[in-house]
């Protein structure tokens, strides 16, 4: 069995006097996870072969044979007919071996002027570029769903919180727009990351470049890269682009996790602000009444998973000298799983948000608790000439009195308010109660970035325009 695992004809077997052990073979093989790079590997190889032919490094007949063989291999992979072999270590050697079996010596010439070091770096960048574009689209879908829900609730009043204590009234639409802003920045980070991903390593070969008269810029143009990696050592050895993407993904998941925490809280019967559609929830095997928000709960958990992948990649790179080291094989599984986790999460969240039922009465009732308009009363006094710190102290005194009596500030009569606040009684008139309503409070925040319904609608319009850019 050992000799079968390390048989003659492998890309590097001639150097060794004894076969590799089966244990080492299985330990070092990557084909069963890096095979997802197969189609981009073929695309990279075709661009490389075309350049080799244009530079007269291989013949036109060789190029035609390579193109014919690769077309057959691509079809086999897409139909699930390709036979992946552990013996052949990785996706690159599996495809090359199959190509050589199909077309003979022309297949052996394909690797002229390149190494698996620059080949895999190119494959990862090609693949990740496409995944960044896909994730960008999914972020847009989620932003769109949030904007739809925000538009429906531009006037829906809820309590805003600090320290999970009622702070000031806001609109639910305004609250949702905060997440739109977060996911907008996430989309910007993804686009920015893409500019550094989209550089061609091919041509760096193993580490020092190649002695063949290659045309790297032609390959970059064929594959849609913005340019080439400027240094061959850097091109094959660094994975900072993957780390950067994973860091951006960790931020995406952090924002999802914050939103998830609120969804779980809002759906709790003790809060009851929203309901999540049944198709996104699960039940209990023992408690018949349960409807559990498993999707947002699981998203919170998966955030830790992506954060872990970021730490794995940072740790992977921190001790590597130049240039390529086998350590870099460990970049793929964290990267692949990060992409899968983020994409799956964004897709399900966009659908889930569209199915949320809002309960405005519960939100309003909660906003009426906790003296949420106390700051408005202080502002009322300030506008009548009282220094803010004095107004703050006076209203805090009034809040303490109302709290002891179990009533809200708005429940005080005008005479009671003046009696309890004798030092500022001369500043208080009948118009004070307009400042103590929830509607008056949110309407007064009528400036860009504020929670006034008109500002919320304007922000939604601007965000929709940004989505179309």
Swiss-Prot record:
It comes from Burkholderia vietnamiensis (strain G4 / LMG 22486) (Burkholderia cepacia (strain R1808)). InterPro entries: Arg_succ_lyase_C, Argininosuccinate_lyase, Fumarase/histidase_N, Fumarate_lyase_CS, Fumarate_lyase_fam, Fumarate_lyase_N, L-Aspartase-like. Belongs to the lyase 1 family. Argininosuccinate lyase subfamily. One of its GO terms (molecular function) is argininosuccinate lyase activity. This is Argininosuccinate lyase. GO terms for cellular component: cytosol. Pathway: Amino-acid biosynthesis; L-arginine biosynthesis; L-arginine from L-ornithine and carbamoyl phosphate: step 3/3. PROSITE patterns: FUMARATE_LYASES. It catalyses: 2-(N(omega)-L-arginino)succinate = fumarate + L-arginine. Its main location: cytoplasm. Keywords: Amino-acid biosynthesis, Arginine biosynthesis, Cytoplasm, Lyase. Its EC number is 4.3.2.1. One of its GO terms (biological process) is arginine biosynthetic process via ornithine. It is found in: Cytoplasm. SUPFAM superfamilies: L-aspartase-like.
